[in-house]
Amino acid sequence: MPSSASRRGEIFLHRGDLAQARYWYEQAVMEARDFESLQALSDALGNLGNVCALLEAHTPAEVCYREVLDIQRTLQDGNAIGETLVNLGNLKTDTGQPELARAFYLEAVDTLTPLKNDRALGILHSNLALQEIQLQNTEAAIEAFQAALEFHRKVGNEDGLATTYGQLGKTFFLAGNSRKAEACLNNATEHFIKLGNGPGEAGALRLLADLYGERGDHISEVRCLERVVQIDKTYRLPQYEEDIRRYETLRQVE
């Protein structure tokens, strides 16, 4: 059962008061040390690490996560170990250290794959792919995105499918593979429509418009931008002014 300090930390976290949440989770860590409960200490340190990460206090967050990892390895909790490795990878991502982030993500893949935690593996492979892009490992990024799609399909993660298809489409586009980029971005658009995610749909359509523009397919480019402008208006997206200017310029060419 969570301690009173942990419960207070959770309350303040839900209220968005991260400073108070951090204070109470620090108290929870001290309580857990006093009671010599490894599981309680792991939980409290994990919560504290998460709050520190949200506060962009990266060094104390890493200290928490590393101690959590030691405890989880003692407890032999594979799924928890994988989650903490992902948290460490995310920290390195946030601090612009893609090589270290990649190393943590790869270790998490090795940990979670035998456990068949498909939902976590889908998200993890997407995270890994983004680091491969930062490291200019395009082929490795494409492979990781494709692996992510397989896991998203297994568990029916529509959000994951939509986002990953969009990311993979952008990767193919930047790599000069227009045909595969178009297929992925159309898939992304379909999934975003299914989810009712207008901003996501607009993002995929903007990339498609760029693709059609490079290809010289004026009609398809205009059609994509027409829909983007409609979404911009509906959701009051900040890209509206830029999108409408581009759309109107293209219409004048017709």
What residues fall within each predicted segment?
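Conserved alpha-helical positions within TPR/SEL1-like repeat arrays
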Residues: 3-14, 39-54, 79-94, 119-134, ...
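Structural signature of alpha-solenoid helical repeat scaffolds
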Residues: 36, 76, 116, 156, ...
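TPR/TPR-like (Sel1-like) alpha-helical repeat modules
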Residues: 213-237
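Terminal, low-structured helical/coil segments at or just beyond the last alpha-helical repeat
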Residues: 232-254
